[in-house]
């Protein structure tokens, strides 16, 4: 699924125009050298302005930044390396990285991310390494979040709040070599089955295999998520527990009761129908007998009249 095809000419024209204004200054308290800007540990609360437009490597780690403005970040069209580790970023908006389509390395670990939309990384087709570990409030990922990051080789999802993951989320990552999934509260219930089977079928073995374990259900607590495929298949597809047997028993009883009632109603209807037909036949016979008797009396009356007529003459 292609969510975006890169920045259009309008964005590039806008970036060029802004570049004429911005110049090539260096942010206060930051170090700028050879297309590299280092603002590590400067207690910044906002994204720094005056970053040279030819910057290729930008270090914003160990600060207090809460957001990444797409308008300013998008001016760095040559940026290939962005480190935002250990800040206070809560969310990255749709198309936050629309102007940095050359980005190869992105570190958003140890922040306060709560959600990532399917469009956040939509233009980062060149991205090779992505780290979003240590975001404990990140509870879910959309199945198309990584749809366009087809060059990704390294993905770190450790220590987030992820409880399950749609198998489609990793389906497009055919070049992925390193995957970290440990430290997450994986709920290995029936909704987790598709992802567990996906890990087996596509040989998607996390680099921290033995540490990426289930926290639920009790039967699978501590099991590596790469090894719960078969147990889950048994529990969710082929295995019947006592609730299933009770359900089947109730279904059988309902079918039996419904059949019995239906048979009884059929019998009652048949008896009523036969009684109705019998009464109708008796009435028809009585009516026929009455007609015969009337006809006989009329015939006798006419015969008597014919016999008496000559005597009167």
From Swiss-Prot:
LRR repeats lie at residues 54-75, 78-99, 102-123, 126-148, 151-172. Mainly expressed in testis and skeletal muscle. The keyword Glycosyltransferase does not apply. Residues 24-53 form the LRRNT domain. It comes from the Eukaryota. SMART domains: LRR_TYP, LRRNT. N-glycosylated. Glycans are attached at residues 112, 148, 189, 211. Disulfide bonds join 26-32, 30-39, 188-214, 190-236. PROSITE patterns: LRR. GO terms for molecular function: potassium channel activator activity; transmembrane transporter binding; voltage-gated potassium channel activity. Residues 266-313 are cytoplasmic. Residues 184-238 form the LRRCT domain. It is a single-pass membrane protein. InterPro entries: KCNMA1_auxiliary, Leu-rich_rpt, Leu-rich_rpt_typical-subtyp, LRR_dom_sf, LRRNT. Residues 24-244 are extracellular. Keywords: Cell membrane, Disulfide bond, Glycoprotein, Ion channel, Ion transport, Leucine-rich repeat, Membrane, Repeat, Signal, Transmembrane, Transmembrane helix, Transport. GO terms for biological process: establishment of localization in cell; positive regulation of voltage-gated potassium channel activity; potassium ion transmembrane transport. Auxiliary protein of the large-conductance, voltage and calcium-activated potassium channel (BK alpha). Modulates gating properties by producing a marked shift in the BK channel's voltage dependence of activation in the hyperpolarizing direction, and in the absence of calcium. KCNU1 channel auxiliary protein. Modulates KCNU1 gating properties. The transmembrane domain is necessary for interaction with KCNMA1. PANTHER family: GH08155P, LEUCINE-RICH REPEAT-CONTAINING PROTEIN 52. May interact with KCNU1; this interaction may be required for LRRC52 stability and may change the channel gating properties. Interacts with KCNMA1. This is Leucine-rich repeat-containing protein 52. It comes from Homo sapiens (Human).
